[in-house]
Amino acid sequence: MCNLYRLDAPANQIAVQFDADPGDDPWDGGYVAPLRPGPVIVSDGRAGSRRRMVPRLWGFPPPPKGRAPVTNVRNLDSPFWIGTLRHPELRCLVPVTRFQEWSGEKGHKRAHWFSLPSQPIFAFAGIWRQADEWATFAFLTCEPNRLVGAVHPKAMPVILHPEDYDRWLTADWKDARTLVAPFPSQLMAVQDDGQPPLL
């Protein structure tokens, strides 16, 4: 499960990349972890509507019996998610420059950073929801491709192709759901840094 990613670009560069209004987001680059804010791209869910970049806190408040914030959307038919997924205005793009998965046993873990060489800034398929104090976000996961699966065989984030950004932000759920699929391995790269966890 991906619980750390980097977005090493300032707000104005991200806004240009996603053809979005940067607003007053102060983001100047860095890492995003659960319960930390990160920029996401939203719209009002209608075709042709202007995209906006806004700060959101990573991690939905947990369900009644949960403890930790929910950062990844796995069961797309769960009542916990489906109400949000069906509303295009509550879907978002999560800008990323690389994301991390761990391998190895406790005490001997290695970090693996995944990126897209042809897209220095790419996007996860995300959703957002207004919580009591903060608007929050999470991103969808799917079966891993060959590259990610060699490190983390359970799941990988849903990475969107740029030509699918509008569909994710505006299409009805039946159409948007078809975008939930592993990103092609041949378009990705991985780097092992061997460093201890940042958190």
Walk through the language-model features, giving the residues of each:
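Short linear sequence motif anchored by a di-proline
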Residues: M1-L199
